[in-house]
Amino acid sequence: MMNIRELLQTRPLLFDGAMGTYYKAAPGVECEQANLTDPAGVLAVHREYLAAGADAVKTNTFSLPRLAAAHTPGWEQLAQAGWQLAVQAAGETGAAVFADLGPAPDTEAVPAGQVYTAVAKQFAALGARNFLFETLSSDAGLLDAVGAIKAEVPDAFVLVSFAVLPDGYTREGMYCKDLARRMQESGIVDAVGLNCVSAPGAMRTLAKQLGGTLPLSVMPNAGYPVVTRTQVKYQGRPEYFAKELGRLAAEGTVQILGGCCGTTPAHIAALRAELDSLPVVEKKAPAEEFSTVKEQTVENEDAFLRKLNAGEKVIAIELDSPRNADLTGYLEGAKKLQAAGADLLTIADCPIAQARMDSSLVACRVHRELGLCTLPHMTCRDRNLNATKALLLGLYAEGVREVLAITGDPIPTAERDEVKNVYQFTSRKLALYIVSLAGEGREMPGPMTVFGALNLNARNFDVELRRAKEKLENGMSGFLTQPVLSAQAVENLKKSRETLGADAKILAGIMPVVSQRNAIFMENEINGIHVEDWIIEKFAGLDRAQGEELGLAISLEMAKAALPYADGLYLMTPFNRVALMERLIGRLKQEVLGAY
């Protein structure tokens, strides 16, 4: 069988094109099922691509990781049949066979690395020596699987290919240069590349930006999809496809080429002819340096960050945006809180999934008119990748340098027929995406600082801390906690400081309880808040003024207990009572913060 490493020393390697969009599967039937139900049809497709001039074919097993993760009965038989059909076809021409693995879901219950390893080992047992991990939006668990392959098959050739949008980011918000760099630095991946999502022209531009010493692969779609009478078709002529990729090969930029969605044997035949017509050129010297995210500089810090990073205790205060289009009263309230001594105004993003004025737009207006630092909350609930990126670029242009990345409260079940959740990200992936936008040659000249949520009242706080560590690893700088209203919350805050370290900035949540009804509601209906019984009982029979006084007293005590383990306080305004929060800030400065 063909030795891939030796071939790449002499000429480019040409893969086949798409199987899924070329093979005519019945509606609703997985293309991979045809390995068992229509082996002759699958074999015929392999033979067409080989006749077109392909040096290598992929097994018809793209969806196997997803099927394996779902414990779909018979996925092993699909792998075996797919392998045997590809080997049979390749044996007729001496072509190489690559075991093809598409993306695996990555969950706590079934990690992606575990799935990739299981599927790869299945192929290794069948005799596979070449492996293609393709159309990936993330590298989660990937290197674990590659390491397992190399341990079992030391001479295995592993090609890893990511699905990258024309702007350089995957659908999970990971930047192509960062992904390529990690593959390069792993020392166990043999080639890296891009496939799917983008058309030839866009992928050519992306490929020219990648650095590193590994062989580079490109397998674009034939073009961009269009829907014609409910059918998805890809526009893009084989001649154009071949010319664009041929230019990359001629420049020595890429060494491995092929096609993805919408490509046919005609595209591969045109590319074969283009490659064969190229003069022999020396391989282009690879650029070993990758663009990395710039470290934060003083120039990119606002007044809040300078104070926080200097070790001073800060005060952040949350004020919910209006439910209507009038911002007059809100700006007046924000100005009063600023005068009282707030360092930062935080603005929730449609809490409890009820529409309010956009938190990011309000943050920009407050920052522009008052000069007060703002922290808009950004949920994963309502925006896809494009909308999120557009909003982040606008925030940066307006001088807003911090954002709180959270998953967001789900939309109530009764409303889901009319209003849909998005949740393209988790808060951890959103943080990584925001951080990746900054750096040389990227969309932001400097980074945004990303904070996350830390639930001190979580029932299984060890799991909460593990997630907090993952958030830090994904680029978050610190956390705003849920309200501290119990001794256990203080203890968990102390544990957080010990576990997460001094570099993780923690703002302890303080929310004044103002009545017994308010306390009972918070305890029973607001996720993430725990109010101890003694607090609820203390409010019995109190009027509004008395309730506020007691709420202030309890908040001061909680702040005193929390501050030894926190970098500042995160105050939450109940019922938009700005006057109450002015008093709280004043007393905190007078009675608590003076000790620091």
Could you tell me what each predicted segment is?
Residues M1-Y596:
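Domain-level signal for soluble alpha/beta catalytic cores
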